[in-house]
């Protein structure tokens, strides 16, 4: 392995680990806030302050975007992300975070299957074995701690499905897509939908520290 390849690998590992850490921080904050306010307000804060952070970034750096490119797919991707977040935050109030992540990590398996079927990606024998092992470990880990026949299981199941479809559509347009366009559409779509909803269902926030949590989730989501 060359030095450039090693540097790239280290960068990928660092970014992946950092992204996962931020996801855990956001979900942990959401789990806490869901106990002190309606979940819909926590979801609103995640997207509204994501949008505010995005506006500040655009004012400072003024990146050029083509928001008309792949418009329909961008809207679909944004709705998938908003749906995944809504169900994820709801599932956090019903199950342990570790159990939810066990289910959530089935998303790469779903993405691989979708890519193989629709994009004709070739799955190697090693890849198939790894997917089967992944699925088996998910089923094994799910059984002892979660009620498989519980209707509430729909909440942790929906997020990986939506996330897998989100990644699939991302891969579909990856060669003709600007990364910040996706961030823009996701922030605007989520903020718009939940701002309209909570304007009719707002519950006063009793402690100012909860606002810090809402802002933090928006920043985590933006990063």
Question: Which residues are covered by each model-predicted region?
Answer:
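Membrane-interface helix termini and inter-helical loops of multi-pass transporters
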Residues: 28-39, 93-96, 139-151, 198-214
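Structural motif at transmembrane-helix junctions in multi-pass transporters
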Residues: 35-41, 87-104, 175-180
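Transmembrane alpha-helices of multi-pass small-molecule transport proteins
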Residues: 12, 36-83, 162-166, 185-201
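Glycine-/small-residue-enriched transmembrane alpha-helix faces in small-molecule transporters
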Residues: 1-41, 147-172, 216
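Loop-to-transmembrane-helix transition segments
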Residues: 11-18, 58, 64-87, 151-159, ...
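Hydrophobic/small/kink-forming positions within alpha-helical transmembrane segments
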Residues: 20-25, 55, 78-86, 108-113, ...
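C-terminal transmembrane-helix exit sites in multi-pass transporters
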Residues: 88-90, 107-129
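Hydrophobic transmembrane alpha-helices of multi-pass small-molecule transport proteins
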Residues: 126-142
